[in-house]
């Protein structure tokens, strides 16, 4: 689960991570009132969406008067912001964050992620603040300093010193930087985050470090421990189909292809997408019906897949272990009664009650259901059907 910048900064403040003063606003007049409360003669108005690259897309602007704050906010609110992370459809701006201006002397990058290879949280820093960190990693990976932090000992001074020396900080800057990094580590661990990014982390004219931007993502499986974080969830920023799928215990991720996929098990689902691409097709989604699949969830899965107008065929690939194939077959029949299944459906069922399932589908005599003998055969047929060649 992701949250907005203003929400991440609220959490930072709780833990003593320095951030500029600011407040969220939902209208132009509200933005003006926020700027008036903050005082000063320079403010930043930031569109609040769950995506990076806002500055380049016109979602971050400076204002030098209260009138300008209100005008910029009114222009941003309601606009659709398209960045490299939103996709071509973009995201609608429903709130803005008004923040006091800062005296920026130097920009850095500071972040934390879970590194699966070392099986530890890793803190990363770079002198290339303000740039896309993925671009830095691809072109100049030597400019990213990393420290793996063993949770059994936590963040130590030597972790901070390695990062500080790598950034080339002056002697008097090292201690405040280490204090900043230590507070950030505590946020990450206490809140069960799986991502924190501060880009940029700035050094001000008076030598302070401030989180000028803030991005946080959380482990969904740990949200039950953090009702305060769960309340920050903004469903309007999430794919509505994915939200609907989660209500039924389905793991769904929308993709750009035209071959719909319904599979049990994440590993088999990824293998299915791989072989579809190998056969010259493009998967339209990732859909794992899980081990508790029943006719109702299968029917719902079809409804979700068919809500994508790009889908030209569906590949149902089930290996029955915990999931019984006859339940999947009955779910397919139920789906044809509840939803207009107007595309070819290639079905490969193997494992528990597979023969019974095959008989159920055969007796139903539904013309657009195409049986497949194995994974490769199913992928070939699904790709061919999507191309209108079957």
Curated annotation (Swiss-Prot):
Pathway: Carbohydrate metabolism; tricarboxylic acid cycle; succinate from succinyl-CoA (ligase route): step 1/1. Binds 1 Mg(2+) ion per subunit. It comes from Nitratiruptor sp. (strain SB155-2). Heterotetramer of two alpha and two beta subunits. The lineage of its organism: Bacteria, Pseudomonadati, Campylobacterota, Epsilonproteobacteria, Nautiliales. Succinyl-CoA synthetase functions in the citric acid cycle (TCA), coupling the hydrolysis of succinyl-CoA to the synthesis of either ATP or GTP and thus represents the only step of substrate-level phosphorylation in the TCA. The beta subunit provides nucleotide specificity of the enzyme and binds the substrate succinate, while the binding sites for coenzyme A and phosphate are found in the alpha subunit. GO terms for biological process: succinyl-CoA metabolic process; tricarboxylic acid cycle. This is Succinate--CoA ligase [ADP-forming] subunit beta. GO terms for molecular function: ATP binding; magnesium ion binding; succinate-CoA ligase (ADP-forming) activity; succinate-CoA ligase (GDP-forming) activity. Its EC number is 6.2.1.5. ATP binds at residues 46, 53-55, 99, 102, 107. The gene is sucC. Pfam families: ATP-grasp_2, Ligase_CoA. Residues 9-244 form the ATP-grasp domain. Its cofactor is Mg(2+). It comes from the Bacteria.
